[in-house]
Amino acid sequence: MMLSFLQLNGSHHDVGVALGQFGAQALHHYAKTSPAWQHVMAFRDHSLVKHMQQQVQAQHPDYWAELQGLAQGLEMPLADVFTWNCRGDLWAWAPDGCTTIQKPGAPNRLAHNEDGDPLFAGYCAMVHIQTESDPGFTAFVYPGSLPGHTFGANAAGLCMTVNNLRTLHAQAGLPRMVVTRAMIGMPNLADALRYVQSVKPAGGFHVTLGQANQRHLVSVEFSHRQCSLIELNEASGHANHMIHAAMQHQPQIVTGSSGFRQIRLEQCLQAHADIEPLEILFDTKTAEFPVFRADPADPDQENTLASAHFEVGTDALQWQVHQGQCFEPVYWFKNDQLMTPDVKATNACNMATNP
């Protein structure tokens, strides 16, 4: 099923309501059938959740309004919806994964597999959001979740991809999904980097950032304890665990999939210097722990739900969204703008082969 495309305008509360209405049917079913939902809801009345709520209300009232609207549109209790949006802060085993390829050059290139709970397959969307306070942006969204913690780009030419980090011993702070929601709303790369270094998140993420007319891609790993930034000068990959030298001592879980994907990314980049990023993202050579993940019995309960490829040019971003191991995009974008709104995925797409 092709990803939906949503166009949302209005106040932050209005946007939240519309996102909730879009995801309501899927999330109601998910709440009844998902062990992950039940596990996260066990934290609903925890003091850590209450503190995180206070932090959002104090530091980001606009995003608190989005969460309130999201709960209204979902027709679910706000406490449940907020707790779900703190899932990765509260529980290291939340079903979020992802893989990113970073290739500095002319232009800089960035590609990403969005790995999430297969129960959400067919229920996600690309959404363009324009509020009164943020630059317009387009991002991949899950039912019941704030935008900004997946992949996307804004009107200022800032793009970002986000990978799960299974950090341990999270502490009170801003939910990591609120941190990345703020980052995709930043007017430029410098402001996004200043912001992520200044806040105190509860949990952790890896974020790769680039901006049109900026020389570098920047890799960011943050946890409650620390934030590390690296300007990338050579091709590299990230498979959702902390790999920065400054962060490797931090307590985390590295699953078999995460570890083997990291090894495979490095193998592909070393063996084929000119390899296309999507060729790596569509790789399945390691059968038990493939880079492209489509097994309903995936050991981390994650499947690749979409892929994105960004070219960070001198004056704009050009990027595409893909589904399946298909090189033919389903959507094309320039910065935050959809370029071909009637695009249909071809049935005769060029499928991936292992390098």
Whereabouts are the PLM-identified features?
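A contiguous strand-loop segment
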Residues: 5-7, 26, 37-41, 58-176, ...
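Flexible, glycine/proline-enriched loop segments at strand-loop-helix junctions
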Residues: 53, 168-170, 176-184
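Hydrophobic, well-ordered secondary-structure segments
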Residues: 107, 176-180, 189, 193
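Extended polysaccharide-engagement surfaces of secreted carbohydrate-active enzymes
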Residues: 221, 230
